[in-house]
A protein has these predicted regions:
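Membrane-proximal intracellular helices of multi-pass ion channels
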Residues: 1-185
Length: 185
């Protein structure tokens, strides 16, 4: 849509790439993750994901204060539904897409998403899954954590796509259908 907000996403991507190059390439001595460590990793991941997820709002100028952008991002990732924005439709389209996408990611849990795309082996992924998924579901769905995450997200993709199709048949344009599907799936 030829918006300047794309620059904010490129800046955040560059920041994250630099952080990865400095810290992410060092492998720990032990790859074993225990239950307590799983809870710490989940907590830190939520904090960091939210902290960096707020940056596009601030860098683009859509939300001028970082604390407000952080609130908006945490609200999305936790699917709280609260907002500090008086006029959501006034956001640039790229930022509006990001805001809705945070709700979609939050719908299944950030950590389940991260587990699906990372290379954790199943033995080390299960403590993270137990820390992220409420109730006994983590142990009962499938013993392989990565497989479970892929299965859940497969169903989530299908539900999201179905909602987009129904909204398109209802007369909504593709962009708005995606935003509504991300925010309600």
């Amino acid at each position: 849509y030829h918006e300047k907000s794309v620059i904010s996403f490129l800046i955040v991507a560059a920041i994250l790439l630099v952080i990865y190059m400095v810290f992410g390439r060092k492998l720990p001595a032990s790859k074993q993750i225990y239950g307590k460590e799983g809870f710490v990793i989940v907590g830190l991941a939520w904090i960091l994901w939210s902290a960096f997820g707020a940056l596009p709002f601030v860098i683009s100028g859509s939300i001028p204060y970082y604390i407000d952008a952080l609130f908006e991002t945490i609200s999305g990732f936790t699917t709280t539904g609260s907002t500090i924005l008086a006029d959501i439709e006034a956001l640039p389209m790229g930022i509006s897409f990001w805001r809705s996408f945070t709700h979609w990611i939050g719908g299944m849990g950030v950590l389940v998403f991260v587990m699906m795309i990372t290379s954790l082996d199943d033995e080390n992924a299960m403590p993270l899954m137990r820390a992220e998924v409420p109730g006994p579901e983590a142990d009962k769905l499938v013993p392989k954590a990565r497989h479970t995450a892929r299965l859940l997200y497969g169903m989530y993709f299908v539900l999201t796509a179905a909602e987009v199709v129904f909204l398109l048949f209802g007369g909504m344009n593709l962009y708005d259908a995606l935003l509504h599907a991300f925010s309600t799936t």
